[in-house]
Amino acid sequence: AADHPLWSAFVWLNELQDTFVEVVAAPWFFQHTYGSGEINLGLRALGVEIGRGAWIESYWFPETDLIRVGEAATVGPGTVVQTHLFQDRVMSLDTVTIQDGSTLAAHSVALPASLIGTASTVGPGSLVMRGDRVPTNAVWQGNPIEPWKR
């Protein structure tokens, strides 16, 4: 975890890297590779720690070195794994962990310091708030997430 003032060089270099991914890497290299080993290789090259057999259908991984996707985990299409937030003109960074066999479903957002436990599922369109911990073998969904009641 780290904090950086809005006007620091770190923040602006970080925005430059995000722009590179959104303007060059995503349209030219990533979008045709969703769900394949190729996107995993590309994201690993940018710094994401990705386990064997992970299924990834999104390129929205800012601060790639702060993200861990476990073995056989799934990141759905349109999902954002967000590792920073701004508050009072300060950029706060923290890790996001998606453990082995877990699923972050389509169009969901995971905020910094969140953890999705082993073999757990976060339903589509859900928001995993900063610091949330989804327990092992659980199903949560909603905005913000809460345990799913069948």
Where do the language-model regions lie?
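Glycine-rich hexapeptide-repeat left-handed beta-helix
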Residues: 74-150
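Short gly/ser/thr-rich secondary-structure transition/capping motifs
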Residues: 33-36, 57-58, 86
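Terminal amphipathic alpha-helical/low-complexity segments used for targeting or macromolecular assembly
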Residues: 1-46, 135-150
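N-terminal segments that cap or nucleate solenoid repeat domains
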Residues: 48-56
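Short aromatic/basic micro-patch
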Residues: 49, 68, 97
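Soluble catalytic regions of membrane-associated enzymes that act on cell-envelope
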Residues: 55, 60-68, 72-74, 80-81
